[in-house]
UniProtKB/Swiss-Prot annotation:
Domain of life: Bacteria
Assembly information from the UniProt record: Interacts with cognate CdiA-CT but not CdiA-CT from D.dadantii strain 3937. CysK forms a complex with CdiA-CT/CdiI. One CdiA toxin subunit binds to each subunit of the CysK homodimer, and one CdiI immunity protein binds to each toxin subunit; the immune complex is thus a dimer of trimers.
Function: Immunity protein component of a toxin-immunity protein module, which functions as a cellular contact-dependent growth inhibition (CDI) system. CDI modules allow bacteria to communicate with and inhibit the growth of closely related neighboring bacteria in a contact-dependent fashion. Protects cells against the tRNA nuclease activity of CdiA, its cognate toxin protein, but not against CdiA from E.coli strain EC93 or D.dadantii strain 3937. Binding to CdiA-CT in the CdiA-CysK complex probably blocks the tRNA-binding site of CdiA-CT.
CDD domains: CdiI_EC536-like
Classification via InterPro entries: CdiI
Protein name, per record: Immunity protein CdiI
Protein encoded by which gene: cdiI
Amino acid sequence: MITLRKLIGNINMTKEPEQQSPLELWFERIIDVPLEKLTVEDLCRAIRQNLCIDQLMPRVLEVLTKEPLAGEYYDGELIAALSTIKGEDLKDQKSTFTQIRQLINQLEPSDINDDLRKDILKINQIIV
């Protein structure tokens, strides 16, 4: 099973937990979690932090196939996170990203608010 530690390498946290930021605590919590077990919240945060974007795409596709408006804090949060990536972040998973794009473009217009519509437009402009 692939984890962030296997992808990034061994990262030594030198701070005591009470000295760590919430981001550091989160990263320490998920670094050994298999990518296929990451939650929607973890995927959103990892994408926003630009962590292993390419390797996360199969899990993102799996989640969005089951729940196209997946989000921990609001509907469409995962789509919003995807709108922040750059085409160069996608190396081996360009076809997976294309599938993700096709999937979100099939959402019913009545299910999409203005912010989500803007995020989808950004995703459609990502060159792969």
